[in-house]
């Protein structure tokens, strides 16, 4: 079975669009882009367009690659204090001279729709309500729920320990809630006995950032595999590259119980959860 993200994202987004159409005012999403990284330009354009399509007011705020931390903090402060803005997203990665943590911490937790502010991360770890969850982990759990894949008591192996995916996803999966409550093993590319552990997992989340890292020899035939990675690999086509995930899809798909494709799996879910967080922020500010 293929775990395609498009129908799941469509269900989430249609609900948001309907609710926005019944609202007297529109939520606002500000997307901050520093520099001119081509991939980041594509992602920013996609997020702004999706928000606009849903009926939100969305704008990209662009700063040059030599922008100082002071420049960025001034912009964020202005957006924090703008009552028409309900969500602020700073596109990562940032130019190397900038402190990403300082930028993220400058965003008001109430407008941190990426869910990366330490306060929102802390609420997530403590199991407290009211914060925003990071979009990709939230999207993964939504994807699994849509396909009626149970998590309660299951062994989930998360390969990757980033602050954006691996760590928050592990915390979300372990929450004492009937819809999660999984037994989680958090791994990385240098973990000892990696294959031995993965073969015991009911669900494998690959978020290690290494193309084709998870091979069919590393999983069991009953495994459900979610591929978070996206990498460009040289190919003999018009683009000169092809997109692949962290999973060796062509071989894994023949062995596992279910797998998410790249592209078309987790990607649409990340954007959908960003829109959901922005809408939730708007509703909180209006209540």
Curated annotation (Swiss-Prot):
Catalysed reactions, semicolon-separated: (6R)-5,10-methylene-5,6,7,8-tetrahydrofolate + NADP(+) = (6R)-5,10-methenyltetrahydrofolate + NADPH; (6R)-5,10-methenyltetrahydrofolate + H2O = (6R)-10-formyltetrahydrofolate + H(+)
Residues that, per the record, bind NADP(+): 160-162, 189, 230
InterPro entries: Aminoacid_DH-like_N_sf (IPR046346), NAD(P)-bd_dom_sf (IPR036291), THF_DH/CycHdrlase (IPR000672), THF_DH/CycHdrlase_cat_dom (IPR020630), THF_DH/CycHdrlase_CS (IPR020867), THF_DH/CycHdrlase_NAD-bd_dom (IPR020631)
Protein keywords: Amino-acid biosynthesis, Histidine biosynthesis, Hydrolase, Methionine biosynthesis, Multifunctional enzyme, NADP, One-carbon metabolism, Oxidoreductase, Purine biosynthesis
Coiled-coil residues: none
Known EC number: 1.5.1.5, 3.5.4.9
Entry-linked SUPFAM superfamilies: Aminoacid dehydrogenase-like, N-terminal domain, NAD(P)-binding Rossmann-fold domains
A GO cellular-component term linked to this record: cytosol
Pathway(s): One-carbon metabolism; tetrahydrofolate interconversion
Pfam families: THF_DHG_CYH, THF_DHG_CYH_C
UniProt GO molecular function: methenyltetrahydrofolate cyclohydrolase activity; methylenetetrahydrofolate dehydrogenase (NADP+) activity
GO annotation (BP), single: purine nucleotide biosynthetic process
UniProt record similarity statement: Belongs to the tetrahydrofolate dehydrogenase/cyclohydrolase family.
Protein purpose: Catalyzes the oxidation of 5,10-methylenetetrahydrofolate to 5,10-methenyltetrahydrofolate and then the hydrolysis of 5,10-methenyltetrahydrofolate to 10-formyltetrahydrofolate.
The protein's assembly and partners: Homodimer.
Protein name per its UniProtKB record: Bifunctional protein FolD
Organism: Chlamydia caviae (strain ATCC VR-813 / DSM 19441 / 03DC25 / GPIC) (Chlamydophila caviae)
